[in-house]
């Protein structure tokens, strides 16, 4: 008797987990309404990288974006924003190509940075 109760519970649990995974995989991430680079930065990025881009150390290390030579070209920030790495969450499903290009341009031309070149949505699409 106990074995059949256990098997029934186990079977129902597996079905519930599988259904939940299917739901999560089929759900689309909500989109951020902001389209300007500064607005996107302050809505998402500044919580960890700080409003002035100086970064922080607390529960983790949040690298400074201000004066960061890794931002000289657009490839690194496009990759990090789209795919994430370690504590940096991937935002590629949350932001569209134009939003990623806008925030990349913002961090490369503000926060004490003045790197050359503009990133386009096409650059982001090609890097995905």
What are these regions (language model features)?
Residues 20-40, 56:
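Electrostatic cytochrome c docking/interface patches
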Residues 50, 54-94:
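Gly/Gly-Pro-rich "capping" loops immediately C-terminal to redox-active cysteine motifs
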Residues 33, 73, 77, 99-100:
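Stable alpha-helical elements in mature extracytoplasmic
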